[in-house]
Structure formats: C-alpha cells, structure tokens
Swiss-Prot record:
Species assigned in the record: Homo sapiens (Human)
Subcellular location: Cytoplasm; Preautophagosomal structure membrane; Endosome membrane; Lysosome membrane
Variant or mutagenesis effect after changing F542A: Impairs interaction with PPP1CA
PROSITE patterns: WD_REPEATS_1 (PS00678), WD_REPEATS_2 (PS50082), WD_REPEATS_REGION (PS50294)
PTM comment text: Proteolytic cleavage by activated CASP3 leads to degradation and may regulate autophagy upon cellular stress and apoptotic stimuli.
Record note on what altering V540A does: Impairs interaction with PPP1CA
Source organism phylogeny: Eukaryota, Metazoa, Chordata, Craniata, Vertebrata
GO MF annotations, alphabetized: GTPase binding; identical protein binding; protein-membrane adaptor activity; ubiquitin-like protein transferase activity
Protein name as catalogued: Autophagy-related protein 16-1
Amino acid sequence: MSSGLRAADFPRWKRHISEQLRRRDRLQRQAFEEIILQYNKLLEKSDLHSVLAQKLQAEKHDVPNRHEISPGHDGTWNDNQLQEMAQLRIKHQEELTELHKKRGELAQLVIDLNNQMQRKDREMQMNEAKIAECLQTISDLETECLDLRTKLCDLERANQTLKDEYDALQITFTALEGKLRKTTEENQELVTRWMAEKAQEANRLNAENEKDSRRRQARLQKELAEAAKEPLPVEQDDDIEVIVDETSDHTEETSPVRAISRAATKRLSQPAGGLLDSITNIFGRRSVSSFPVPQDNVDTHPGSGKEVRVPATALCVFDAHDGEVNAVQFSPGSRLLATGGMDRRVKLWEVFGEKCEFKGSLSGSNAGITSIEFDSAGSYLLAASNDFASRIWTVDDYRLRHTLTGHSGKVLSAKFLLDNARIVSGSHDRTLKLWDLRSKVCIKTVFAGSSCNDIVCTEQCVMSGHFDKKIRFWDIRSESIVREMELLGKITALDLNPERTELLSCSRDDLLKVIDLRTNAIKQTFSAPGFKCGSDWTRVVFSPDGSYVAAGSAEGSLYIWSVLTGKVEKVLSKQHSSSINAVAWSPSGSHVVSVDKGCKAVLWAQY
C-alpha cells in the first residue's frame, strides 16, 4: 500500500484494528517494558562474557606459546599467573553458568509471558465479541424502547381520548337519566290520566248502553203488552215453545204434542204480565253473551272428521308485505288468512277458490310483527311485535283493542290460553309474562334465563322454546318449571298436535322432533338432505289431523313429512326465492300457506 495514503483513507475495519493494536501496546508495554530492558542488559552481559571468554581462550593458547618462546623466564611468576588465570576462569565460568541459568529463567519467563499474552489476546477477542453482541443488544433494546415509548405515547393519547369521551358520555348519561326520570314521571302521570279517562269513557259507554237497553226493553214491553191483549192462537211452531223446554221436567218422558198442548194451556191460563216477563227473560238471556262463538268453529275433538290433503300445486303467489314476512295464520274457520311482516302491519286475506283477496290491514304496531294467533272464535287477533309489545285487534272492524307493554326486549311470540281471557308472551328479554285481558294488566312475570323464541299452551301448562337449546314446561299456577328438555340446537318453533299429546319442535341443527308429552321422550325425528333451518324464528306446523308436519327451508323449499312413516312426503319448490320463515295449514286441511324473507306468500293445495 502506498505510504502517501492517510489514515482516513484506510477502511474503517483497518483503522479499528490499528487502534486496538495501539491500545493493546499501551496496556501491555508498561507491564513488560522493565523485563525486556533487563533481558536486553543480560543479553549484553552475555555477549560481553562471550567476548571475554574468547579472549581468555586466546590467551590460554598464547601462554604455552610464550613459554615455548621464552623458556628462561621465572617459573614462580608463571605459576602465580596460571593460578590467577585459573581462578579468573573459574569465576568467569561460574558467572557464565549463572548467566545461562538466568537466561533460561528469562527465556521461560518470556515463554510464559507469551502464553499469557496469547490467553489475554483470546480473552480480549472474546470480550470484544461480547462487547459487539452487547452493543447490538443495546441497539436493539434502544430501538424497542423507542417503539415502546411511541406506543406508550399513543396509548396515553388514546386513553386520554377515551377518558374525555367517557366524561362526555357520563355527563350525557346523567342528563339523559334526569330526562328519563322526568319522562317516566310524566308517562306515569299520563298513563294515570289515560286510565282515568278510559274508565270515564267506559262508564259513559256503559251508561249509554244501559239507556239503549232500557229503551229497547221498554219498547219491547210496550209492543208485547199490546200484542198480549189480542187472542193468541195455538200453533205448533210457536216460539213460546222455548218456555216449555225451560220449565218442563226433563226427567219426564213427554211427546212433542203433549209439550205443545201443555205450553198452550199454560200460555192461555197465564196472565199477560207473566207472559211478558217470560219473553223478556228469554231475550235478556240471549243478549248476555258478548263473545258469540260461531257454530262452525266449535270442535270438541280437534282434528277429527277433517280430510287433510297433502298440497302439490301453488294456487296463488302474491306479495303479502313491503319487506320480510315473519308470520302467517289461518282463522279457525279457514276463511281468513292473516300475515305479519316487517312493515309493521298485519294483513287479512280472504281465501276462496284459488285466490287470496286482500280484505284489510291492522295497524298500530311500531315495529315488525313476529307472531300471529286468532282466538278460538276467530273474533280477535293477537300479534307480537319487535317494539316490545303485543296487541289485540277485533277482526270484524279492524280496530286495535289492547296494547300489552312491559317487556324490555322484542316480543317473539304471544299466544291465547284456552280460556281466551289470558295471554302468554315470550320475549328476547328472557322473560315470560301472563296477561289478564279482563283487568288488562300483567299478572305474572317469570324469568326463563334465555331468550324465548316460541310458545304453545295447554290447559295448565305453557311450553316455551329458547335460545339456549332448551324446551321449558311451565305450570301456570305455580310459576315454576315443571321440567325442561335440552336439544342439540337453538329452538326456533313449537307446535302441538290436535290431541295436545305431542309437541313438535324445530331447532337450528336442522332437525324436527316430535316429543310425547305423556312420556317426556322424543318420539320421532324428521330431517332431509336439503332441509336447512333458515333463521332463529323459522316456524313449523302440524297438519289439522296430526298426520303430517310442514316446515320451510333456507333455500326456499317447503318440506312435508309423514308422521306415520317418518319420511318426506312432498317437497314443494320453485316458488320462493329466499328462506321460508313460517308455514300455516288451514283447519279444514285443504290449504297450506308459506311466507318468506322476501315479500312473497304462496297458497298451496292438492289440485
């Protein structure tokens, strides 16, 4: 390398090596400098002694020569001289031996020092490697520390932001809590005033009805009194024959002729006032019942005498609502069809022939409808809603009669009890509530522990299907769970067979199960390769005679299973383009209706 290059021109690693060598030289020179100086002095002495030894050796050879040259010298002097030379040689020999000894020691010391220096070099290299590793670790730790400081700053800023937001939310919450308290008080006051006004209105209505009744009674009494003054011919088809049925002894065997003649005799011998009172009592008793039951709806043996036909053809496809349709139900007489959707309305349709004609709409709900049910007479319709309430309308005039509020979550199912005077509702707030329609209040609240998706009722038992995969059986009188059954999936729907001895359930594991309520055991399980439960509120239904079960699938097909064989009886498809939410089978057994998540409803029949 050229001597003209400066130190700065060398690479960094060369400069580093040079600095390390100079540093090592400074550290090690102080320790070995004195030894090296002494060693050099000893070498100089050794060289001097070597020269002296050579000189003495030369003189040793010269002495005999001088004796040979000058044999006449004095012998005594020569002996003395020889003794001195011998002593001097012995002395030099000892000094030489001592010097050789010291030289060996110094050589050994040099070897030891060299070994020690090599060990120190290795230690220094190891230390340098450790130092480099430590420096790298320090660099990494400094980088990590810098990152952590950055993250800490970010977290502190985020924490401060969250704290500010929390303080703001706390202030807002305090203000809203005050407003809520004030609004609650105002609402309570308004409810109190509203109840008082309703009571006054009811009293006024009752008074008007009483006045009308009195006027009708007075007019009727007047007309009957005028008619009683005229002679009454005895005819076999006279309506006064009803009195005979009420006053005659039922244990006595009488013929129709004897009954009629006895009625005529009693009528002729009876004063006008008694006859008038009897007729008035008859008409009065006829006007007592405010909830008449149509004769075609009375069925002492549910499902008996009904011809159920498995549907095979879509008779009518129509858009039932503006959006998703969640519920569908036939009236007890199979004449009316009710549908409920997310457009907050319940719509009534009249089924005749192969058509469904729109009859009217029931409004008043503030959110989507989740379930629908008619009472046993078909006069009232009950609907549950996502606005935390259930509502009752009269079917004849489409008027909203009752609004049942009290749940803190959306009401997913509401059903009439068999007496039609009480209602059970199940909600997403994990409670079931029992309502009395006479007093229009909630008389019982039961905490179920899980969101309730559907409800069915018997005389004294309420069965509820829940999100936690359990079916719970409640005793209405004791408000306690009689028993519960856990399935493999979340329960979406329940239904009872006509005899109310078997319970049909649908769950999110895509299985339908029939449970025998007498043995509390699963009797049958229905499934199909293409069947899939589409939502947490997919409804299923028994046929009116309990021979079939029907359910809609997520891909839009309607599946019908035979209870007798346990196999799929029919699969109806190509009409729905989205998941089927609910299915209803008409009480007459001739029609089936399915509704989907789109807006469609399909009327199915056998022909």
